[in-house]
């Protein structure tokens, strides 16, 4: 009897474990009430108390109600969609926005799989707020021509990968922020409270093209308030073509730009702000193992406007058409720059203030051969 009871208890325990391991069925957004797909997604999330996957089926949807995704829930829900789900945002705010939840901490929020199309009046496609652990992947984000495809505001330790981001003002813009310490929490450059910089953001394996301002823009919209620079962000393996500008770091520390494909942008890699002083400087940026197609319309592949301890190595280029003053690297203000082992084939490897040459010795910089 004891053996039978033990076996029965063991089998019930295993069945309970199996039931707990079974994934919860996705909730179709179209099954919820609402005025449009944005409103329906919001209602579906409320119905399951943020404890489910809300799924957007294939279809063409027009919506003006912003999708609100609450942060700090640590992996209890996600927003997923079919690749054939096309969401056309007609509003003037953020198509998908996040809000800080009832407690601080990680979110483990996942947004994936569908197409998000904007309009010239929209602020952004996806607006991420301060938290840890958000992933945006396998998305198409296009047409936010007056704003940002993805706006990263004070977010930490998050991943943006394998997306097509095109025809936006900025593909991905990262900004610091300050948030109130009392609820309801408000964040913004004019708010008094706790500072959040964008740190450890990993932007990898995306195609970011035809941005009218920048493909990737670390924008220092506010300094002071105890804010640090944007720290140790990673931009790797991206295809950055035909943008007005590719990557611009205004105020950063330890950012890595690696193994990207650059072609056809008016400006490619820009480090620091002209005459910005220490408040707007790139500290310790690493620009490594990237490829550049060099053309006349892009005078410089890498611009060091104001940087300290920049490391530039292992990059290569294919020279198409060049002008007499094209330079692989143009330096305005820098200290302790290390440039080596780059496969440079154009006439001028280095320029100082737009004129072929290097800074005078004594600033701690090292410049090695072109090839």
Task: Mark where each language-model region is.
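Intrinsically disordered, low-complexity Ser/Thr- and acidic-rich flexible linkers and loops
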Residues: 177-197, 222-228, 275-281
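Bacterial N-terminal signal peptides
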Residues: 4-16
């Amino acid at each position: 009897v004891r053996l039978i009871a033990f076996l029965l208890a063991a089998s019930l325990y295993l069945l309970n474990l199996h039931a707990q391991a079974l994934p919860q069925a996705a909730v179709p957004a179209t099954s919820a009430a609402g005025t449009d797909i944005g409103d329906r997604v919001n209602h579906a999330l409320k119905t399951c108390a943020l404890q489910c996957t809300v799924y957007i089926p294939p279809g063409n949807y027009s919506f003006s109600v912003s999708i609100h995704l609450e942060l700090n829930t640590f992996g209890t829900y996600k927003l997923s969609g079919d690749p054939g789900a096309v969401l056309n945002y007609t509003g003037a705010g953020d198509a998908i926005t996040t809000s800080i939840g009832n407690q601080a901490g990680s979110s483990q929020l996942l947004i994936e799989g569908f197409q998000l199309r904007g309009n010239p009046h929209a602020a952004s496609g996806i607006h991420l707020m301060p938290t840890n652990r958000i992933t945006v992947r396998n998305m198409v984000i296009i047409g936010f021509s007056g704003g940002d495809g993805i706006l990263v505001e004070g977010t930490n330790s998050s991943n943006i990968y394998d997306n097509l981001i095109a025809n936006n003002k900025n593909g991905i813009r990262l900004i610091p922020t300050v948030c109130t310490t009392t609820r309801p929490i408000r964040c913004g450059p004019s708010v008094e409270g706790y500072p959040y910089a964008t740190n450890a953001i990993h932007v990898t394996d995306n195609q970011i093209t035809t941005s009218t301002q920048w493909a990737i823009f670390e924008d220092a919209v506010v300094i002071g308030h105890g804010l640090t620079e944007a720290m140790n962000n990673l931009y790797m393996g991206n295809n950055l073509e035909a943008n007005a500008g590719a990557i611009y770091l205004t105020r950063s520390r330890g950012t890595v730009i690696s193994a990207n494909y650059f072609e056809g942008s008016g400006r490619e890699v820009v480090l620091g702000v002209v005459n910005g002083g220490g408040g707007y400087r790139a500290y310790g940026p690493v620009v490594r193992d990237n490829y550049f197609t060099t053309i006349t319309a892009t005078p410089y592949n890498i611009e060091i406007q104001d940087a300290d301890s920049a490391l530039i190595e292992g990059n290569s280029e294919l020279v198409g058409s060049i002008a007499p003053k094209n330079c692989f690297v143009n330096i305005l203000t820098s200290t302790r720059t290390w440039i080596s082992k780059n496969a440079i084939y154009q006439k001028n490897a280095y320029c100082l203030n737009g004129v072929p040459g290097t800074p005078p010795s004594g600033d701690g910089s090292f410049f090695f051969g072109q090839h």
